[in-house]
């Protein structure tokens, strides 16, 4: 066998082995979250645009009731949780072993919607307001904003009606004067039926990390590099969302994933992204926004004391400027 033939055979064998070798399996990341809505555009886009795939991540979400999301994480049934920041912070103050590793939504993209005869928040004195529960963060934020207007909790009555759909229906039926918090699509339905926007919360609340990604101490110990890649994909997704050139494609993605028509999708995108800048933080921890959440929770006695925001965050996921 000549040297040239032997070399050819060796190269061919190497090529065969390379072609036969399996690709590196993607790292599976399991996550608990509430039912998917416009507040989940970051993960929707990360899936649809391949940002998770680019980071070699197989994303597996499990949807459940809001109060179960953090419980699933602490029980060890998922790797991380996407939750209202308040749920995770409350759990942490009660001994839960979990940390914030990033932001999911920034600001508070809700509106106070009232009957058409009411023109300002002051008009709600003596009225019944549709709320979630006494310990709900939506109730806490509403009371704080009303207090800023000089309207104490004793001046109105909050009824524990339920979630956005139930609050919307309570306003539509005339059962209450207003809903303390509505977001797409229910705010649009109320407005289209002649109800009045009494407050865009973003006019009062400039900075709050409303939603967060949480990891358990166990997950952080066992799969930190994977979680870093996960948050990098989320950051890429938010940057993509915030680029105006992608608006039309984002609307199409929303239509497909949220099962809504083009008009609602376009209005929702405008409300969530350019108007409320809900994904402006690009997945990073927002110290100012966390401090505001801590202030609200302590004010309403949902946590026992006002601890430093660093207490709730894994230091490895802090933005460089905050370290």
Residue ranges, per PLM feature:
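Pocket-lining segment of extracytoplasmic ligand-binding domains
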Residues: 87, 165-258
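Bacterial N-terminal signal peptides
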Residues: 8-20
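Signal peptide processing junction and immediate N-terminal pro/mature segment
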Residues: 22-24
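Short, glycine-/small- and polar/acidic-enriched structural segments
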Residues: 26-163, 167-173, 177-184, 197-207
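Positively charged n-region of N-terminal signal peptides that target proteins for export
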Residues: 1-7
């Amino acid at each position: 066998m000549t040297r040239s033939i032997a070399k050819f055979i060796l190269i061919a064998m190497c090529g065969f082995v390379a072609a036969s070798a399996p690709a590196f399996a993607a790292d599976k990341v399991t996550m608990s979250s509430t039912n998917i809505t416009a507040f989940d555009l970051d993960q929707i886009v990360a899936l649809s645009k391949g940002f998770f795939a680019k980071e070699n991540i197989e994303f597996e979400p499990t949807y459940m009731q809001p109060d179960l999301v953090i419980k699933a994480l602490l029980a060890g049934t998922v790797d991380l949780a996407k939750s209202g920041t308040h749920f995770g912070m409350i759990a942490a103050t009660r001994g839960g072993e979990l940390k914030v590793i990033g932001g999911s939504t920034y600001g508070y993209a809700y509106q106070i919607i009232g009957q058409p005869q009411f023109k300002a928040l002051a008009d709600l004195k003596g009225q019944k307001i549709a709320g979630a529960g006494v310990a709900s963060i939506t109730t806490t934020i509403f009371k704080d904003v009303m207090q800023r207007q000089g309207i104490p909790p004793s001046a109105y009555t909050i009824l524990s009606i339920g979630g956005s759909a139930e609050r919307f229906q309570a306003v539509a039926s005339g059962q209450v004067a207003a809903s303390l918090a509505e977001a797409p699509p229910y705010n649009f339905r109320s407005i289209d039926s002649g109800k009045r926007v009494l407050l865009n919360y973003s006019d009062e609340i400039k900075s709050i990390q409303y939603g967060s990604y949480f990891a358990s101490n166990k997950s952080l110990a066992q799969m930190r590099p994977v979680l870093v890649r996960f948050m990098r994909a989320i950051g890429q997704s938010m940057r993509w969302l915030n680029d105006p050139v992608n608006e039309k494609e984002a609307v199409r993605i929303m239509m497909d994933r949220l099962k809504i028509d083009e008009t609602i999708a376009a209005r929702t995108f405008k409300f969530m992204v350019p108007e409320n800048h809900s994904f402006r933080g690009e997945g990073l921890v927002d110290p100012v926004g966390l401090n505001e959440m801590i202030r609200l929770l302590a004010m309403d006695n949902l946590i026992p004391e006002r601890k430093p925001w660093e207490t709730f965050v894994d230091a490895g996921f802090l933005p460089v400027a905050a370290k």
